[in-house]
């Protein structure tokens, strides 16, 4: 099925869905609220509903029991920033510019010194939702650029409590400043200063602060009778892993498990508030993660990717297959499991559909509208593309995944103890040199072999059939692809968070060094 026919088919499926919701009729009711819960480095196997044996996620498991579980839901990239850019634009990072051309097949993101960020030419989800009267808030990690022009309130959000990057540090504020925490336009402190994180004990109150921001926003918008979009993008399971005092030491899985338990408790409180306010039937909630669990973290500080190979930074299943739950009481029937191949980019198009809006017609949108899947059980045929930088590494079509390139990380890093596939290395598959397979891709049947350990024999009829179908999809994709201007090539220490807006009031302004733009170095 071509991309064009897939889009037409999706629209045909969507029309009766929108009619049923009353969104196409004159005088349609207020569109539903939208809550996207995006975790940071949480793995597919971290939830009880996906088989995690300690069963420490009762609220998320209940959310799945009351909604729809997606076992085959994917990130658009195995790293934070490109994945988030894809969610908010509905477009692959190769299209929206969140990639690097500094080296072949390199993952890149937005550290403090990055010059680039989300381009003004991209239409972000909150910008479009404003057209339908939504009030939009981001809580947590932005990660789409540090410079003033990339501020989330310049890209459709009305409120922000969080940071432009993760809680890395502590830094010395001389060579590198601590990351600021913002309330709307101005910083209100920095990580490890006004917002402490105890690296020895793992204690930090950040998740509780993020939770309270979400609850207060929901209550306020409910009182205003205004449709709202809440993008709750907390960073609790990203290393260094932290949890609040009341959750530390409560999990069988160590500090990482403590963080997961606190997240689960927070999600439960958000869902309970929606129910107690009587707005759960008019609020669509989706839970997922930005990429797979980071398996290189310290002992008991990394998550689980279940049966899948490797983790964050790789384009094996463990790096890009995510936990995903849709919840919308009264609309999504309880207890469903969908085998639709889903993507984080689908949240863009689905959210627009919920608001009664169409995606921009002047560009390619990679995200599909999943309402026909969630409300009527339809399965839409589509490929999943796995990129690393500007390199197409693999594609999944149906149950078959074809690897065009394989690489985990360099031998140099591996010998230093950096292993993205600890205890899982597969000969000829998890390679420490970049191996090209474009002529004869490694093809796996993910239904029989989710761990990507046994590639199909090149001479088998099954391989030849899968090769023919995936080759057609790859050629069509590459022929029509117009890459965006790469945003992650140039770094400059002078653009770090030395003197963010609001630093004067706090006495937190630091002196930036001389401006020296240079090529960013991306190791893997």
Curated annotation (Swiss-Prot):
How does it get modified after it is made?
The conversion to 3-oxoalanine (also known as C-formylglycine, FGly), of a serine or cysteine residue in prokaryotes and of a cysteine residue in eukaryotes, is critical for catalytic activity.
Where is this chain glycosylated?
205, 425
Query: Where does the record place it?
Result: Lysosome
Going by the UniProt record, its keywords in alphabetical order are:
Calcium, Disulfide bond, Glycoprotein, Hydrolase, Lysosome, Metal-binding, Signal
Q: Where does Ca(2+) bind?
A: 40-41, 80, 290-291
Q: Has keyword Lipoprotein?
A: no
What does the record give under GO molecular function?
arylsulfatase activity; metal ion binding; N-acetylgalactosamine-6-sulfatase activity; sulfuric ester hydrolase activity
Cofactor(s) demanded: Ca(2+)
Any Pfam family: Sulfatase
Region annotation (Catalytic domain) maps to 28-381
Disulphide connectivity of cysteines: 310-421, 491-520, 503-509
Predominant subcellular localization, coarse grouping? other
User: Signal sequence span per UniProt?
Assistant: 1-27
Q: Which residues are annotated with the PTM 3-oxoalanine (Cys)?
A: 80
List the catalysed reactions. Answer: Hydrolysis of the 6-sulfate groups of the N-acetyl-D-galactosamine 6-sulfate units of chondroitin sulfate and of the D-galactose 6-sulfate units of keratan sulfate
Family, similarity comment: Belongs to the sulfatase family.
Q: What is this protein called?
A: N-acetylgalactosamine-6-sulfatase
For this protein's source organism, the top of the classification is:
Eukaryota, Metazoa, Chordata, Craniata, Vertebrata
Q: Provide the gene name from the record.
A: Galns
């Amino acid at each position: 099925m071509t991309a064009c026919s897939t889009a037409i088919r999706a629209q045909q499926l969507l029309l009766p869905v929108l009619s049923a919701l009353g969104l196409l009729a004159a005088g349609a009711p207020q569109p539903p609220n939208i809550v996207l819960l995006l975790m940071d480095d949480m793995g597919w196997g971290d939830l009880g509903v996906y088989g995690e044996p300690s069963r420490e996620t009762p609220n998320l498991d209940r959310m799945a029991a009351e909604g729809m579980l997606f076992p085959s839901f994917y990130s658009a990239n195995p790293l934070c920033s490109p994945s988030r850019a894809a969610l908010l634009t509905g477009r692959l990072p190769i299209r929206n510019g969140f990639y690097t051309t500094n080296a072949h097949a390199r993952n890149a993101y937005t550290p403090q010194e990055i010059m680039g960020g989300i381009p003004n030419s991209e239409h972000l989800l909150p910008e479009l939702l404003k057209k339908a009267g939504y009030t939009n808030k981001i809580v947590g990690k932005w990660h789409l650029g540090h410079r003033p022009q990339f501020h989330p309130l310049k890209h459709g959000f009305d409120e922000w409590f969080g940071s432009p990057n993760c809680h890395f540090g502590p830094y010395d504020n001389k060579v590198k400043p601590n990351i600021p925490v913002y309330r709307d336009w101005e910083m209100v402190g920095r990580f490890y200063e006004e917002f402490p994180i105890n690296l020895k004990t793992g204690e930090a109150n950040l998740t509780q602060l993020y939770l309270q921001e979400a609850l207060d926003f929901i209550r306020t918008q409910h009182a205003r009778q205004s449709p709202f979009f809440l993008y709750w993008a907390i960073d609790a399971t990203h290393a260094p892993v932290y949890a609040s005092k009341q959750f530390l030491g409560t999990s069988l899985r160590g500090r990482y498990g403590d963080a997961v338990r606190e997240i689960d408790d927070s999600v439960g409180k958000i869902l309970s508030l929606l129910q107690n306010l009587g707005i759960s039937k008019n609020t669509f909630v989706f839970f997922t993660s930005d990429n797979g669990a980071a398996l290189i973290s310290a002992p008991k500080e990394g998550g689980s990717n279940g049966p899948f190979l490797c983790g964050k930074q790789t384009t094996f299943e463990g790096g890009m297959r995510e936990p995903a739950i849709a919840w919308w009481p009264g609309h999504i029937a309880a207890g469903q499991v969908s085998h639709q191949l889903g993507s984080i980019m689908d949240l863009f198009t689905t959210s627009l559909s919920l608001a009664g809006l169409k995606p921009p017609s002047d560009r390619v949108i990679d995200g599909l509208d999943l309402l026909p899947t969630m409300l009527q059980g339809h399965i839409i045929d589509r490929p999943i593309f796995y990129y690393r930088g500007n390199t197409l590494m693999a594609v999944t079509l149906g149950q078959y995944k074809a690897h065009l390139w394989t690489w985990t990380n360099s031998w140099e890093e591996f010998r230093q103890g950096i292993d993205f596939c600890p205890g899982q290395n597969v000969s000829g598959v998890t390679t420490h040199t970049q191996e090209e397979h474009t002529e004869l891709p490694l093809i796996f049947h993910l239904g029989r072999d989710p761990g990507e350990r046994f590639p199909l024999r090149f001479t088998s009829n099954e391989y030849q059939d899968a090769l023919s179908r995936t080759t057609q999809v790859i050629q069509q994709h590459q022929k029509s692809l117009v890459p965006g201007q790469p945003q992650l090539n140039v770094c400059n220490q002078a653009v770090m968070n030395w003197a963010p807006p609001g630093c004067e009031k706090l006495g937190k302004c630091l002196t930036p060094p001389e401006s020296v733009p240079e090529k960013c170095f991306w190791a893997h």
